């Protein structure tokens, strides 16, 4: 643990602030997987042979494609070609219909969404070369995040101010950057076994006599095992898991623990949330105060937090919430916590490597991002 933290001392002295607004303006998509043949052919045809760079269809893929082609190939798309022209431009690029397109104009047609068949229809009247970028875009860019981040760039630029420590700010900056560029995450990354617990152990002296832990999204119980390995002790652990198959494995794993540990664990097979059939955390029959709530429930974190607002108000536990399932998690999760307990929590952001971290050197951009809310 100490070694891991020491490794990232280099990040604490780099800069005091990270300009997210400039990041949105200047980030360029990096080419990771566009074949060299396609790339060189596109550049040659458009610069040397007079082929007109265009994209078929005014779609979300085309929106990303405009930037992809500009950033990766330094080519500006001349036209967006559509079946029927109902508007003049699409994100700054002129829109024309197939019938408006001059016959025999040589086209370099970029495809981003398996629309090769539609593009071939244009070939009936125009000589063209199709550059299929579908796979390259899919491998480079997580589209929902990319578009949401750009559509809400000002909100994300402002949001960095909720973090006071340098590692959190750098993590936030590099995490967003990885989605805008299609590059690997290059910020601080900690071993996954410390997820939820490194920050908790550091701040638990500010919690009121650590007693109960709500482990929401227990899966197979690996988090519980790690807590025991680093000697965290709770009076009670509420292991909550919605997947019935996971519950079977979880139950078997808990049975392997010593009786003194297993008797403290209550397994609950329910989905947490606000719907009538869901479990509201406020309805738990708690035997002792709660000092830690962690959540990793595939995008249901906001509803689960709202279902626990009385627990949070009453016990002010440390919250460790996964914030990587939805594009808006880094906005909505801290806002929800602040709405439940105004001015009571400070926020810390940490990134962890996944279980395959050794193969990828612990660098991942789409998972294991945890937002901590720590009582001030």
Each PLM stretch: what is its role?
Residues 1-54, 58-73, 86-88, 102-233, 243-287, ...:
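S-adenosyl-L-methionine
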Residues 73-75, 128, 232-233, 257-262, ...:
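Short helix-capping segments at alpha-helix termini
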Residues 78-84, 237-241, 318-322:
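Short internal beta-strands
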Residues 134, 318-358:
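C-terminal substrate-binding/active-site "lid" region of AdoMet-derived donor-dependent transferases
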Residues 210-223, 268-334:
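Active-site segment flanking the S-adenosylmethionine/decSAM binding pocket
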């Amino acid at each position: 643990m100490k070694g891991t933290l020491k490794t990232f001392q280099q990040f604490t002295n780099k800069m005091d602030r990270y300009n997210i607004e400039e990041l949105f303006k200047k980030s360029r998509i990096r080419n990771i997987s566009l074949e060299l043949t396609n790339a060189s052919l596109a550049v040659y045809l458009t610069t040397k042979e007079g082929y007109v760079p265009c994209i078929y269809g005014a779609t979300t893929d085309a929106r990303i494609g405009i930037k992809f082609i500009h950033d990766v190939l330094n080519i500006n798309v001349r036209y967006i070609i559509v079946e029927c022209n109902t508007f003049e431009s699409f994100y700054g690029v002129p829109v024309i219909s197939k019938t408006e397109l001059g016959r025999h104009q040589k086209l370099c047609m970029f495809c981003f969404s398996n629309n090769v068949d539609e593009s071939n229809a244009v070939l009936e009247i125009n000589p063209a070369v199709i550059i299929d970028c579908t796979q390259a875009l899919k491998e480079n860019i997580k589209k929902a995040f990319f578009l949401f981040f750009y559509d809400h760039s000002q909100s994300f630029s402002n949001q960095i101010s909720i973090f006071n420590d340098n590692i959190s700010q750098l993590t936030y900056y590099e995490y967003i950057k990885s989605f805008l560029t299609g590059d690997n995450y290059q910020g601080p990354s900690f071993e996954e076994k410390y997820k939820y617990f490194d920050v908790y152990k550091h701040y638990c002296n500010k919690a009121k006599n650590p007693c109960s832990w709500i482990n929401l999204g227990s899966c197979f119980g690996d988090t519980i095992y790690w807590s025991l390995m680093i000697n965290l002790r709770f009076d009670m652990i509420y292991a909550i898991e919605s997947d019935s198959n996971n519950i079977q494995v979880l139950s078997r794993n808990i049975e392997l623990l010593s009786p003194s540990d297993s008797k403290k664990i209550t397994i609950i097979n329910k989905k947490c949330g606000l719907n009538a059939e869901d479990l509201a955390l406020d309805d738990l029959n708690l035997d002792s105060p709660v000092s830690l709530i962690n959540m990793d429930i595939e995008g249901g974190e906001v509803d689960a937090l709202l279902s626990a607002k009385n627990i949070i108000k009453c016990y002010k536990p440390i919250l460790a919430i996964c914030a990587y399932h939805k594009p808006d998690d880094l906005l909505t999760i801290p806002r929800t916590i602040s709405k439940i307990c105004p001015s009571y929590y400070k926020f810390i952001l940490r990134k962890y490597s996944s279980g395959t971290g050794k193969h990828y050197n612990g660098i991942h951009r789409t998972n294991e991002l945890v937002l901590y809310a720590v009582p001030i």
